[in-house]
Amino acid sequence: MEIGEIVLNFVGNNEINLIIMRIINCLKAAVLAVLVGSSLWSCSGDKGKTRYVPVVLDGEEKWSILDTKTGDVLCQNDFDEMPSVVEDGMFVVRTKSGYYECYKIDDSKNAIGKGKYTQLGTFGDEDVTFAVKEGQGIMIVNKKFEEVKKLPKKVSRTSGFSEGLAAFCKDGKWGFLDTKGEEVIPAKYDQATPFSDGRAFVLKNEKILIIDKKGETVKSMSLDKYNPIAFYHNGYAPIAKGDKVVFLDKNGEEAFTNSKMESDGCYEINDGKTVFRRDDRYGLISTDGEVLVRPKYLSLEYANKNRYIACNDDFKFGVIDAKGDVVIDFEYSGLKQTSVVADRYFAKDGNSWVLINEKGEEQTKDSYKELNLAGSHVDVFYSEVAEEPVFEPEPDDYSVDSAVVEEVAEAY
């Protein structure tokens, strides 16, 4: 599972899409995340690239999986419910009975992980994940779905694994477990984010702490003075300091800042550059402070090296490079780059999505009425026997697909 990778499949009325995007940008500037998917969000599109994307073909009702490299449709119309994004050739899907099963991409007929799992994570870069069976606590399972460890009843919640560690909550405090389920950092924090780039933000006694994977404090900051914006990425983390944005290095020291960057924008360093917000518009700036693309777009998102997805004032999406030159014309109502193939984009025009290259040429004969770009079904796991009462979301709350945004758009 990638850190903070919450990707909404923007569809429908573009004015509503932009409102939703701005709401998300406001959430990004909230204080500390309790867990992935809460307040600290990944700002760019370089995480979570995948070869396989769940889709619903136009004219169909069931889910298939698209190979974005070959254009082939796999597991065609095999699933009533939306599968998770495929990670390491495996994916999770909910059955009609409401339980989760795991399949391999080359065999969608035979589940490798059966059982009455009410929650089941994907494996990502790890050989283990979290799972919860009906009426039981949280457990760790391997790729053969053998139980590695059943966590104590006092453990009420966990995040997914990231960099070999997972945040967990016990007796109302947060710490970190390793992939064997051992407590490597004791539960002593009020809140905690997952690890990214070897660092995590935690909250303790009204102080924001940056800790390393040994649990040692790298930096302590006042909650009144600093406000984390996003996770560490490529060695830096953006943080709001009053109305300014400063980037902290991995020692927690201020590495650079720029007065042109507003604190409620979305910042993450990629290739020595970051998207920045000014006067309600987005542009591109280097870490040296040079404005590369003036802030003129309603949204701007890092897609790949030297490629950025932008939305203009006509609510049309296109792709620009780091000089601001147009690579893909602004003629689509939606655009996403999630494929491991760098020049493959999902583009939306009307009610359908198509897979295109940078020349705007369609790469498959099919079009798609729905995509799952949201990642895993479950990013936070809840014990069903925890001694500490916690809010447990309904299964449908675990992921966000195109229908969610379409319902919002129709309501307006």
Outline where the language-model segments fall.
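Short, Lys/Arg-enriched N-terminal segments with co-localized hydrophobic residues
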Residues: M1-I20
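Glycine-centered signal
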Residues: M1, V11, I24, S402-E406
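Bacterial N-terminal signal peptides
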Residues: A30-S39
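Long, low-complexity, intrinsically disordered segments
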Residues: P395-Y412
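Residue-level detector of conserved, function-critical positions
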Residues: S44-E394, Y412
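Bacterial N-terminal signal peptides that target proteins for export
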Residues: I19-A30
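Intrinsically disordered low-complexity regions specifically enriched for long asparagine
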Residues: V11-G12, I16, S38, S44-K49, ...
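Hydrophobic, helix-prone linear segments
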Residues: N9, K28, C43-S44, Y99
